[in-house]
Amino acid sequence: MKLSTTAALVMLAASPAFAADTASQTFLKKAIEGNYAEVEMGKLAQQNGKSDGVKQFGQMLSDDHAAANQKALDAAKSLGVSAPDAPNAKQKAEHDKMAKMTGDRFDRDFARYMVADHEKDLADYKKEAKQSDAAGDYAKGQIDALQKHFDMAKSLSSVKSSSR
């Protein structure tokens, strides 16, 4: 009996449905950490940014990612995912690095970081949006906002690059 229970658990763990659940859980955890990070980076942009565009983008990031995080937390709860309550260590380190900058340097590095970050986020969210669960539904609902953030970051990045 013990052998058959073990075999059943091994088969379950190897099943595509179990793998999809694990991928969705991982996605949600990363999304929640990312949302916390974006809220904090948005606040930082409002404090340390020089241009009105960077400050306005920071406000948008804080507002949009705070709202998105509530939806991500709801999706995590519905899937039984233990949600993180803060950005991850790498995100905190990036925030701390950026917190030491001000003015044009902050604006330039912030815009570059946001382009790279949102480009990766868009790829991750588009992949997850193909899933037919709460994580996929959450991802689908965020793609337009992420695209808007990506486009705005690119615009700010090109302005900062050309104004050197």
State the predicted function of each range:
Residues 2-164:
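His/Met- and acidic-residue-enriched segments that coordinate or traffic transition-metal cofactors
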